[in-house]
């Protein structure tokens, strides 16, 4: 009986290990460096420590093996704390968070890089092109299915063809019909 329970628990644990895939998160500085030798679009997950939907997106979306594999293969993935204390060197300009209060357990001051990107809600995903120019911010929790649409939109540069809400709806409709 004990051996059977051990076997079942081992199977469950090993199944969870197979299902869980880690995104190779790097800094924006590292992504800019890698762009020089192997250009890829960048996806930046902008989060805060207190944000519940941010934590859910980490758990449910970014730990999804299909999403993680797609990100690792097609993008440089950057994770950035919108209220953190780290300095950011983006395109030769230094951004920091002068209002950061150490030891704060809730909300903190917004980082200047977050402000530069025009991000005011969390979670927000910002896509950058291969020249590290911001393309678009997507604010709000995204499921694996929802983020997949955006990942393909930006990987395949289809966003360049979208000029209106109708164009975007058409893209989604065409994308879903292929699935």
Model-derived segments and spans:
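Bacterial Sec-dependent N-terminal signal peptides
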Residues: 1-22
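A short beta-strand-turn-helix
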Residues: 24-42, 71
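Short active-site neighborhood of thiol/selenol oxidoreductases, capturing the structured segment around
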Residues: 38-52, 77
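Typically the conserved alpha-helix immediately C-terminal to a functionally engaged Cys/Sec
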Residues: 54-72
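Structural microenvironment flanking redox-active thiols in thiol-disulfide oxidoreductases
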Residues: 73-90
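Short, internal strand/loop/helix patches
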Residues: 94-117
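A short, hydrophobic beta-strand/beta-hairpin element that forms part of a small beta-sheet core
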Residues: 113, 121-137
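Thiol-/selenol-based redox modules, centered on thioredoxin-like
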Residues: 134-179
